[in-house]
From Swiss-Prot:
Gene that encodes the chain: bioB
Sequence similarity: Belongs to the radical SAM superfamily. Biotin synthase family.
Record: residues binding [2Fe-2S] cluster: 112, 143, 203, 276
Family matches, as NCBIfam families: bioB (TIGR00433)
EC number: 2.8.1.6
Record-given protein name: Biotin synthase
SUPFAM superfamilies given in the database record: Radical SAM enzymes (SSF102114)
Source organism of this protein record: Bradyrhizobium diazoefficiens (strain JCM 10833 / BCRC 13528 / IAM 13628 / NBRC 14792 / USDA 110)
Role of this protein: Catalyzes the conversion of dethiobiotin (DTB) to biotin by the insertion of a sulfur atom into dethiobiotin via a radical-based mechanism.
InterPro entries associated with the record: Aldolase_TIM, BATS_dom, Biotin_synth/BioAB, Biotin_synthase, Elp3/MiaA/NifB-like_rSAM, rSAM
Subunit field text: Homodimer.
Amino acid sequence: MDAAVQVQRKKASNGAQVRNHWNVEEAKALYDLPFADLMLQAQRAHRKNFDPNHVETASLLSIKTGGCPEDCGYCSQSAHYATGLKATRLMRCADVVATAQRAKDAGATRFCMAAAWRTPKDRDLDSVCDMVNAVKGLGMETCVTLGTLTPKHAARLAEAGLDFYNHNVDTSPEFYSKIITTRSLQDRIDTLAHVRDAGIKICCGGIIGMGERVEDRLGMLVLLANLPNYPESVPINLWNKIEGVPVEDTAEPPDPIALVRLLATARVMMPRSVVRLSAGRQYMTDELQALCFLAGANSIFVGDVLLTTNNPKVDRDADLLARLGITSGLA
């Protein structure tokens, strides 16, 4: 047996804390543990920091769809590709609040608002800040994703009372340039630093199933875990099939057990993060989702649509959580 695997297996058996400064080799040794040992370590980390029978429920709305100048090779909203998606203007605040109220009535406790921009213009940011303030007035947590931010942008959002800012790193540093060329990984990391400096919590994760290697998935986790403060929320997305984008030619759905292993590894590496089982759940069986929750995933998006792709029906989610004895709400 490899020495690194022996060390990780020993830690799984005695409950010792895994170090905070990670490299891909350590993450791979953890990921490759015998399944029961990995799940045990993930459960220990999960139970130490969260109620293991509870998931956070969030809702996601595209407040400005399509026409994005970035060339992210996985995205239906990029203006670089003919995906058949019609670009829209920024929604009115009243319409956003009405949607948030419906999401709250359906059980969501966090409302996430996404705009397909490279970076927000000042007048648009003012409108988003009004939305944040109004949604918070409903008693919901707020999250927005608006592209890259300057320190001034982040400070303005903090002043509006924003709880979370989502800005995914998407994949490993090594695979990044194969899917995006118009925005560097450092641009993303700089935005995360501006958000953190403004006192806003970070939501940051990535996408799997784009043709990347297992080492790329783990490299993404290492990047996140080694940030000065790792994200409070880590969404793991399965790529949703979108016709007309470059990733369509390289995509390969991950093996279900590989997904569970990745979630368990994320849970151990970032034990205090909310790990969100995000896009792609409509392709998963109930049994797979149950394993994902057992691995430490403790957040989902509820609602029939995620931006431009489908999501499990609300009734299906409610039935699954009830059968598992899992409550939902704020994490």
